[in-house]
Curated annotation (Swiss-Prot):
Protein name (Swiss-Prot/TrEMBL): Pole-localizer protein TmaR
Coiled coil: 22-42, 70-104
NCBIfam families associated with the record: PRK05423.1 (NF003844), PTS_reg_TmaR (NF040881)
Role of this protein: Pole-localizer protein involved in the regulation of several cellular processes.
Swiss-Prot/TrEMBL keywords: Coiled coil, Cytoplasm
Gene that encodes it: tmaR
InterPro entries (alphabetical): DUF496, UPF0265
Length: 112
């Protein structure tokens, strides 16, 4: 009986090993996708910046362009933060409503 359980235990260990590896690969893929996206954004930023910078511009002009771009990006970040807060609030409200609906459905089950 002990011999019969050993292959099964080995199968479980192999399954766990494979499952962990699969999860690790998924995390690595997600991490690489974030790095790709971040670097693509950097390339786009540099492309945009090169469109604004013209030969003969002073350093002050270039710094002004960079400051303006930074302000625009900070405004976008603020907008996304506000949007996420609104979505989180809506999600919490929906969770409360769903919980209330679930409690209402459970009341008739208790009486039965």
């Amino acid at each position: 009986m002990d011999n019969a359980s050993k292959p099964s235990f080995q199968n479980v260990l192999e399954f766990v090993r494979m499952y962990r590896r699969k999860n690790k690969i998924r995390r690595e893929i997600t991490d690489n996708e974030k790095k790709i996206r971040d670097n693509q954004k950097r390339v786009l930023l540099l492309d945009n910046l090169s469109e604004y910078i013209k030969p003969g511009m002073s350093i002050e002009d270039v710094l002004g362009i960079i400051a303006n771009m930074r302000s625009d990006y900070e405004d976008r970040v603020d907008d996304y933060i506000i949007k996420n807060a609104d979505l989180s609030k809506e999600r919490r409200e929906l969770s409360k409503q769903l919980k209330a609906m679930g409690e209402i459905k459970n009341i008739p089950n208790i009486k039965n």
